[in-house]
UniProtKB/Swiss-Prot annotation:
Transmembrane stretches, start-end: 11-31, 36-56, 87-107, 132-152, 161-181, 203-223
Motif NPA 1, chain ranges: 65-67
GO molecular function, one term: water channel activity
Name of the featured protein: Aquaporin Z
Length: 248
C-alpha cells in the first residue's frame, strides 16, 4: 500500500476520532436531562478507535495519533521515514474533525467556545482543577499504558483478531480515569484540533499535550522492545509493522 493511501487513511481515521469523541463531549455530554456524561464520552472515544481499527487497520495500521506512531517507531515497528507524513495527516485530520464539529455546534443558539470545546487543559482549565504536575504525570502514564496495550495486542504472539477490541476498550478506560484530570488527550492530534478553534489558553497549554503523550509513548516503545519482544519480532520497515492485525 502506498504511503499516500496510508496517509489518507490516517487523515480519515483521526477526523472520525475527533468528530466522534469530541463531538460526543461537545454535543451530547451535558444535553438537558439525557446527557451521556463522562462515561458516554469515554465510550464514544473507544468506539471511534474500535470502528476505525477495523475500517483502516489493514490499510495504515490505524495509528490516528502521533504518539502511537512515535511509540511504534521506538519499538522498531514503524520506519522513521514515514513518521512525518503520518503525523501531518493525523494533525490535519484532527483539525478537519474539529472544524466540522464547530460548524455543527455553531448551529445551536447560544453556542460558545467558552465552554472549552473539548480542549485539554491543566490548572484552572483542568476539569477537576488538577495541577500542571498532576496532569503531566497522568498523560505520560496513560499514554505509556495505552502503547503497552497496543504493542502487546498487536504482537505476533497475541491472539489474532482481538487487537481492535483491546485497544478500543483501553482508550475508553483511559478516558474514564483521566477526563476529570486533563479532559484526556493521550493524542496530540486530538488536542490540536479543538485548541486551534478555542485559541487563547488552549493554545498556550497545548505544549503539554504534545510533550507528555510523546514521552509516554516513546518510553513504552523502548520498554516493550527491550524487555518484552522476542528475537525475530517485527523490525522497522516490515509491511506488517504498522498494522493493527484484525484478521481472524
Amino acid at each position: 500500500m502506498s504511503l499516500v493511501k496510508r496517509s489518507v487513511a490516517e487523515f480519515i481515521g483521526t477526523f472520525w476520532l475527533v468528530l466522534g469523541g469530541c463531538g460526543a463531549a461537545v454535543l451530547a455530554a451535558a444535553f438537558p436531562n439525557l446527557g451521556i456524561g463522562f462515561a458516554g464520552v469515554s465510550l464514544a472515544f473507544g468506539l471511534t478507535l474500535l470502528t476505525m481499527a477495523f475500517a483502516i487497520g489493514h490499510i495504515s495500521g490505524c495509528h490516528i495519533n502521533p504518539a502511537v506512531s512515535i511509540g511504534l517507531w521506538a519499538a522498531k515497528r514503524f520506519p522513521a521515514t514515514e513518521l512525518l507524513p503520518y503525523i501531518a495527516a493525523q494533525v490535519l485530520g484532527g483539525i478537519a474533525g474539529a472544524g466540522v464539529l464547530y460548524l455543527i455546534a455553531g448551529g445551536k443558539a447560544g453556542f460558545s467556545l467558552s465552554g472549552g470545546f473539548a480542549s485539554n487543559g491543566y490548572g484552572l482549565h483542568s476539569p477537576g482543577g488538577y495541577t500542571l504536575l498532576a496532569c503531566l504525570v497522568c498523560e505520560v502514564v496513560m499514554t505509556f499504558m495505552f502503547l503497552m496495550i497496543i504493542l502487546g495486542s498487536t504482537d505476533r504472539r497475541a491472539p489474532k483478531g482481538f487487537a481492535p477490541i483491546a485497544i478500543g476498550l483501553s482508550l475508553t478506560l483511559i478516558h474514564l480515569i483521566s477526563i476529570p484530570v486533563t479532559n484526556t488527550s493521550v493524542n496530540p492530534a486530538r488536542s490540536t484540533g479543538p485548541a486551534l478553534f478555542v485559541g487563547d489558553w488552549a493554545i498556550a497549554e497545548l505544549w503539554l499535550f504534545w510533550l507528555a503523550p510523546i514521552v509516554g509513548a516513546a518510553l513504552a516503545g523502548l520498554f516493550y522492545h527491550a524487555f518484552l519482544d522476542e528475537p525475530g519480532e517485527e523490525t522497522e520497515g516490515t509491511p506488517a509493522s504498522a498494522q493493527l492485525r484484525t484478521e481472524a
